[in-house]
Amino acid sequence: MEAQVFLASGSPRRKELLTQLGYQFDVLSVDVEEIHQEHETPLMYVERLSKDKAQAGVKAIEKTKNKYTPVLGSDTIVVIDGVILEKPKDFKDAKRMLLALSGRQHQVMTAVTIATPEKIRTKTVITQVWFKTLSEQEIEQYWESGEPCDKAGSYGIQGSGGRFVSRIDGSYHAVMGLPLMETDQLLHQFL
């Protein structure tokens, strides 16, 4: 069956969630530099990255595939006190982030963009997440599991990092990397 959409992401979580929605899709590998600009608020940043990924996907398929097939780009960031927590560079970085989140509330922002050469639409979901207080031992054991290495904010809610979450207000799937309802609504505008 022909793809209904191209997913401009290598994230296994986004692949899993798009599959859950029941869409036929192909994965595109896009290279987008993820550098926060000084003038950007966290919201502007996550939306720009989402759009950049979708537009890079549109450019990638223009010459080789059906250029009218929509491309989905998405990005997720973790924000506490207005500071963006990216993927950790090493254990020290992950520990710094997890200690900052420990016992506190933070935001997870996920932007989803669908693009074709003629049209682009973006939706952003902001979810409030509360963490329990973490011990240094919990942080070390979590790091040793390998799970935090490729995750914004150094945790994955869908894995063992979920044990740190005491409450959420918003979309669980957005925290994972792709809000289901909003993604489905966007795709319906294109299909």
From Swiss-Prot:
Kindly state which reaction or reactions the protein catalyses: dTTP + H2O = dTMP + diphosphate + H(+); UTP + H2O = UMP + diphosphate + H(+)
What is the top-level taxon of the source organism? Bacteria
Its GO biological process annotations read: nucleotide metabolic process
* SUPFAM superfamilies named in the record: ITPase-like (SSF52972)
Q: Which cofactor does it need?
A: a divalent metal cation
Specify the signal sequence span. Answer: none
Record EC number: 3.6.1.9
Compartment(s):
Cytoplasm
Q: Supply the alphabetized keyword list.
A: Cytoplasm, Hydrolase, Nucleotide metabolism
Q: Where is this site: Important for substrate specificity?
A: 13, 76, 158
Catalytic-site annotation from UniProt: 75 (proton acceptor)
Listed InterPro entries: ITPase-like_fam, Maf-like
Q: What single Pfam family name could you report for this chain, choosing any that match?
A: Maf
- Specify where it is mainly localized: cytoplasm
A GO CC annotation recorded here is: cytoplasm
Q: What class of enzyme is it?
A: hydrolase
One GO molecular-function entry: dTTP diphosphatase activity
Function, please?
Nucleoside triphosphate pyrophosphatase that hydrolyzes dTTP and UTP. May have a dual role in cell division arrest and in preventing the incorporation of modified nucleotides into cellular nucleic acids.
The family classification in the record reads: Belongs to the Maf family. YhdE subfamily.
Q: What is this protein called?
A: dTTP/UTP pyrophosphatase
